[in-house]
Amino acid sequence: MQKVLVTDERRMLPTYASMPAEELPMFAENRVHQRSSGNPYPCKIVAQVDRQHREERPFRVITLENEYLRLELMPELGGRIYAALDKRTGYDFFYRQHVVKPALIGLLGNWISGGVEFNWPCHHRPSTFMPVDVSIEEELSGAVTVWMSENEPLDRMKGMVGIRLAPGEARFDTRMKVYNGTPARHSFLWWENAAVPVNPQYRLVFPPDVHYVQFHYRKNVTTYPVASGVYNGIRMGDGVDISYHKNTHQPTSYFCATSKYDFFGGYD
């Protein structure tokens, strides 16, 4: 294959209805959300979910494909990677969500699981369930970058994520551009939230100099890979190897401590 193939199509997906946003403003100056104030004003909040009404709905899907990978992007759902297929093995190496089912995790309410969610200026970003702008760049080398961008609705800062796939490579790159077009100073976070399929053998891989992990806001700390004591209300006992996903029986988070290395991963 001499160049990356790009397709732009509409695809039907089972979709649960999104509830109407609250009409009254939420003044939540003390609402904590991923180390930001979490104050949604003047944006409206979706505060309920609908689990009764589901229908087939069309969504725009942009596909990038070379000899090894097929990436599916969904600009109408926050500008996310919906799925990524290893063509050699037929394996979806990100979790492919087969239904659009909003949950109340986003800063403004709606959020969906699966694929890769891109977040700015905080996590999970205000517009994670909103459409974004799209532009496609084709290089002379045959590589293609799909840029998905927006002016986020709270601070009006611009964030752009570019998904680049080149011919002959069994990998893709994400690129980012950020702009503050306002006269004010704003804090900024960039977070790429990937969902992966797991099994009893799935193992978290942190760099070799990481010996402890932290919970959100550094509220709790425990040793890694073998944890003990109490962490986020979970009794670890005399020692649990938390590098294996099967040993975590309750919802929680393990954030990698400071490291001189620039990688992490998972292996199944």
Predicted regions and their residues:
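Acidic/polar residues at beta-strand termini and the immediately following turn/coil
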Residues: 74-76, 86, 119, 152, ...
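A short secondary-structure junction signal
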Residues: 158-162, 174-175, 187-190
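Core domains of carbohydrate- and sulfate-ester-processing enzymes
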Residues: 107-125, 213-230
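Extended, loop-rich substrate-binding clefts of extracytoplasmic carbohydrate-active enzymes
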Residues: 27-56, 61-65, 113-171
